[in-house]
Amino acid sequence: MLILPTVKGEYQKDYNLKHLTWFKVGGDAEIFFKPLDSEDLASFLIQNRQKLPITTFGAGSNIIIRDGGIEGVVIKLGQNFSNIEFIDNHLIVGSSCLNYNLAKFCQANDISGFEFLVGIPGTIGGGVAMNAGAYGSEFKDIIVRIEAIDFAGNFRTFTNAESGFKYRGNNLPKDLIILKAVFKVNKGDSENILLRMNEINNTRSLTQPIKERTGGSTFANPEGLKSWELIDKAGLRGYRIGGASMSELHCNFMINNGDATSKDLEDLGDFVRQKVFEDSGVELKWEIKIIGKYV
């Protein structure tokens, strides 16, 4: 019998994760845990002593969960981890805050430099973890430091430099759960900020399948190249496997056409990688995270 650590938050067993992902695919979490607060999370981790495997889960926007589900404990930080505070000319933002919500907060408070977040689905924690970026800006451009907890239950802080940000990644330890990000603040004009955000939203509407079941950019851009151009050159715009296809509108976006499985999506992505390599000699790297067990 599985004995779980005593917590104040909520456990659910065999919890279906499909409805939490943007692709609407995937299996169950063996254990799903939403901690009450940082202290509750630390207590769980200390009691667990790294015995049960741990997977962190954000907004589900840039992820494929395999159909066999996830062993161990899936930890999702809820609304209690989404606060936005303005202290000493810095923004302190909980990791479960949506990027869009932070962009809107900054616009309402005449804070510039966060406009690009309106075009990035997902949470602050996920954005930090992958150094997400769009429209000429990345998380590394605005972060001062990161507050996190490791799987042993130790609270840790990393400066921007210590985080080792790089294109769609960082050099942070892998056994971290990001709790907060601290951002520098530059004042701007609310109307100009709103204009830029509207420009970004309009561009997304015209060039990306934002109304479809998708996970955002499928592959990271190789240095000096565009993934969508390589995919298009290989003749894969609109290509379909099962219920999954490459978008006709933007062929670096995969779409669940309504009946796709996780296997359809992963098989399609692997097929695209193979064909692009055969056509251009370039090995595309997944930008979407794939986790879980095969059926």
UniProtKB/Swiss-Prot annotation:
Keyword Oxidoreductase annotated: yes
Subcellular localization, as worded in the UniProt entry: Cytoplasm
Highest taxon of source: Bacteria
Protein name in the entry: UDP-N-acetylenolpyruvoylglucosamine reductase
Similarity comment text for this entry: Belongs to the MurB family.
NCBIfam families linked to this entry: murB (TIGR00179), PRK13905.1 (NF010480)
Enzyme kind, highest EC tier: oxidoreductase
GO biological process terms, semicolon-separated: cell division; cell wall organization; peptidoglycan biosynthetic process; regulation of cell shape
The keyword Nucleus belongs to this UniProt entry's keyword annotation: no
A single GO molecular function term of this UniProt record: FAD binding
Reaction catalyzed: UDP-N-acetyl-alpha-D-muramate + NADP(+) = UDP-N-acetyl-3-O-(1-carboxyvinyl)-alpha-D-glucosamine + NADPH + H(+)
Cellular component per GO, a single term: cytosol
Protein source organism: Rickettsia akari (strain Hartford)
